UniProtKB/Swiss-Prot annotation:
Associated pathway: Amino-acid biosynthesis; ergothioneine biosynthesis
Originating gene: egtC
Gene Ontology MF, one: hydrolase activity, acting on carbon-nitrogen (but not peptide) bonds, in linear amides
Protein name as it appears in the record: Gamma-glutamyl-hercynylcysteine sulfoxide hydrolase
Catalytic activity: gamma-L-glutamyl-hercynylcysteine S-oxide + H2O = S-(hercyn-2-yl)-L-cysteine S-oxide + L-glutamate
Keyword presence, Hydrolase: yes
InterPro entries per UniProt: EgtC, EgtC-like, EgtC_Actinobacteria, Gamma-glu_amide_hydrolase, GATase_2_dom, Ntn_hydrolases_N
Organism in which the protein naturally occurs: Mycobacterium tuberculosis (strain CDC 1551 / Oshkosh)
Length: 233
């Protein structure tokens, strides 16, 4: 389980989304307000952002609230497309940097909020870790993000207890799914935020219904029920 956040819009500092908001990921790492499973997200954190078309990552297996080095550098990290997460490891899963989102295939950044039985996922060398989220990410990358809707529906059918909230970014798109956990959206004048839970009390936040696919581009936001989804158009 985790809390994750994505941004697509104007260039902004990473700190403005992750550290500065009153209920941002820094606070969500120890006091989330809407988390259904787990009480804290102290098993690591990761920030990914796009440097032009190149995805960059900074990940740690330590709690976000205590990372003074990241806190000092985050205001200088700026991008038009950002994906960040704080992690609460599923019981039995390793606590290590390679198990910490965001995961990448060199083009996309991806985070998974939830849990899935690894037995329903194909084993493969592409996964960054043996944890369920990393194997799920590798499965999604293998099928392609254009098939995200179909992939989530199939995995959900194979594991009825799975929670499959995905957030992915490629520099020009944000793609997300809701499957068993919360996701909120904020349309700002300078861009769009997708987040597991609101980072402040702005009245503009709205909740995404469960079992939906969300796509954010420069043209706008599209929501599709997952039983009708075939991935981003």
């Amino acid at each position: 389980m985790c809390r994750h956040l994505g941004w697509l819009g104007a260039q902004v500092a990473v700190s403005s989304l992750v550290l500065d908001p009153p209920q941002g990921l820094r606070v969500q790492s120890y006091a989330p307000r809407r988390q259904k499973h787990g009480l804290m997200n102290a098993d690591g954190w990761g920030v990914g952002f796009f440097d032009g078309a190149i995805p960059r990552r900074w990940r740690s297996a330590a709690p976000l609230w205590g990372d003074t080095s990241f806190h000092s550098v985050a205001p200088a990290l700026r991008s038009h497309c950002i994906l960040a997460a704080v992690r609460s490891a599923t019981v039995g899963m390793p606590i290590e940097v390679s198990a910490t989102p965001p995961f990448t295939d060199g083009h996309w950044l991806l985070a998974h909020n939830g849990v899935v039985d690894r037995a329903v996922l194909p084993a493969g060398p592409a996964a960054e870790s043996v944890c369920d989220s990393a194997i799920l990410a590798a499965t999604i990358f293998a099928h392609g993000l254009d098939a995200l809707g179909d992939t989530i529906v199939k995995v959900g059918a194979a594991d009825p207890n799975a929670r499959l909230n995905i957030l992915a970014a490629n520099g020009s798109r944000l793609i997300a799914t809701t499957w068993g956990d919360t996701l909120s959206i904020l349309r700002r004048a300078d861009g769009v935020v997708l987040a597991s839970e609101p980072y402040d009390d702005d009245s503009g936040w709205g909740d995404v219904p469960d079992r939906h696919l969300v796509e954010v581009t420069q043209k706008g936001v599209t929501l599709t029920a997952l039983d009708r989804a075939k991935g981003p158009r």
